[in-house]
A protein has these predicted regions:
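Short aromatic-glycine-(Arg/Gly/Cys) micro-motifs in beta-strand/loop hairpins
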Residues: 1-25, 82-85
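Secondary-structure transition/turn motif
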Residues: 7-10, 31, 75-76, 89
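Intrinsically disordered, low-complexity coil/linker segments enriched for acidic/polar
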Residues: 12, 32, 54-55
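Short, mixed-charge low-complexity intrinsically disordered segments
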Residues: 37, 41-89
Length: 89
């Protein structure tokens, strides 16, 4: 099982006034690394257009540092801040 946590920066001035580094966090679990990588490398809107999106656990605004504790790898891709944790069980 692969768990992916992906954060997209929020440019909305309303959220920027509330928190310094707001992001939309999307968390999802996958059965294979190939499926996980497809999600990691996709734009959220494009991904949801191709899939029904019902299996996404949560989309919420939160502070960047709140997800930082479990980050294994942090990379920039296509304008997104992507945080993902690969974990097998």
């Amino acid at each position: 099982m692969f768990k992916v946590i992906k954060c997209e920066r929020v440019e909305n001035p309303f959220y920027k006034a509330l928190v310094e580094n707001p992001c939309i966090r999307t968390e999802k679990e996958f059965g294979t690394e190939k499926e996980a990588n497809e999600f990691i490398n996709s734009d959220i809107d494009e991904y949801l257009a191709k899939h029904d999106g019902n299996d996404i656990k949560a989309i919420k605004i939160e502070f960047e540092w709140q997800v930082g504790a479990s980050i294994k790898d942090n990379s920039r891709f296509g304008g997104l801040d992507i945080y993902y944790l690969k974990q097998s069980w």
